[in-house]
């Protein structure tokens, strides 16, 4: 569980920094980073976790009343696409993918980084 927290908070922080550098909304990047593996850590199942995480967090984000429909769409799209490292998506998608990769590399230096 501690590794999950470290990964999620690290991905959120890294996504925010990358977003600032690239001119992408850093707040949305950080929220995306914090929630990107929601279903994976909730259920322990890795398969389809990106899409399932996006579906699961959509009503949670809406219920807060803090985000517009467009912002929720951007966050959930980035989350849904973060495991698809082979295809280039929209800027927020790419920020999250890169932050996720960096965190995996920083957390586990004994394995190779996911291919980008």
Q: Predicted regions span which residues?
A:
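His-Asp-centered metal-binding catalytic motifs of divalent-metal-dependent phosphohydrolases/nucleases
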Residues: 26-44, 49-53, 57, 74-83, ...
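Inter-helical turn/loop segments and adjacent helix faces that build the functional surface
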Residues: 61-68
């Amino acid at each position: 569980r501690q590794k999950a927290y470290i990964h999620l908070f690290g991905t959120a922080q890294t996504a925010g920094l990358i977003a600032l550098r690239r001119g992408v909304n850093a707040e949305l990047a950080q929220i995306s980073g914090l929630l990107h593996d929601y279903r994976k850590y909730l259920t322990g199942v890795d398969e389809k976790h990106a899409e399932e995480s996006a579906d699961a967090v959509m009503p949670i984000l809406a219920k807060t009343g803090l985000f517009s429909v467009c912002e929720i769409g951007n966050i959930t799209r980035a989350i849904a696409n973060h495991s698809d490292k082979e295809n280039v998506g929209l800027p927020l998608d790419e920020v999250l993918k890169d932050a996720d990769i960096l965190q995996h590399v920083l957390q586990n230096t004994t394995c190779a980084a996911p291919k980008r």
